[in-house]
Amino acid sequence: MKDLKHLLYFENLLQEAQNELILQAQSEGKVCVAYVCENTPEPLLNLPGAFSARLRAPRTGSMEMATYYMTSFLCEYSRALLERAIEGGYNFADCLITPDGCTMMNRAVENMELLKALGKGKEKFFFEYMEIPMKADDNGLNLYTLQCTNHILKPLHEHYGIDISDKAIRQAVAEHNRICELIRAIGEYRKGDKPRITGYEFHVITLATYVAPKYLLIDKLEETLEELKSREPDEKGYRARVLVVGSEVDDTDFIKLIEDTGAYVCACLLYTSDAADEGLGVD
């Protein structure tokens, strides 16, 4: 298939944790709210005047320092983040909010705070730790609401003057929903015998929305969606349609490797909340 117009642009956003859109948003005076886990509600991190960026550690090499502090028993992702933080790779962040959904991730962020690895030269920088409910019932909802208020809304307002009114929250939710609509619409082109987008391309596009200011991506996502409507698909050349399931992965080459063997990744629960419905035709 003909290359997508903005694919290289999306790929380049994934090359560095501090990508060009983060720099652009901060030059506009916006606050960078870093996070490390999907249990942190993204819309609340993208209130007017702020934007979210999920921390990554692209091209990680040695993790000796992080392993010293966390041992080799903890997952590579948490150690890679700590290693990059020690190297000074996240000093662009204005705050870091993390949930306790994963002990390893929590420990990584605690080490960042103890080692003063983030926030150099930023007097307003803060760390916040959320308690995540284990049950989706009324008590769990009340706890989650309280945690979001105490560890996201209030700190952002008190430290940076971010508007946390209902109107501001609804605006952020609307923007988040628009991103979700575009991603779902783009993902629809993975269906059918001759899909118009590869699993690798979809992974790259989806991941870009996690690591860059969303409002700066909407126009390119809309253009990509329009482009797919008229994109000529390849003749069926894959041997099987594959659903990949597991923990989140931010290594797009992993999906590319699978597709290079002749498979087609039509759905992946490693980086999206795809439902494996009948239309995806999983083999």
Positions of predicted regions on the chain:
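Extended, H/D-rich, highly charged conserved domains that either
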Residues: E181-L269
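Acidic/His-rich segments in extracytoplasmic proteins that coordinate ligands and/or metal ions
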Residues: A80-H157
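An N-terminal, globular interaction/scaffold subdomain
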Residues: T40-I86, D94, V109
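Conserved small/polar residues in nucleotide/adenosyl-binding loops
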Residues: Y271-A276
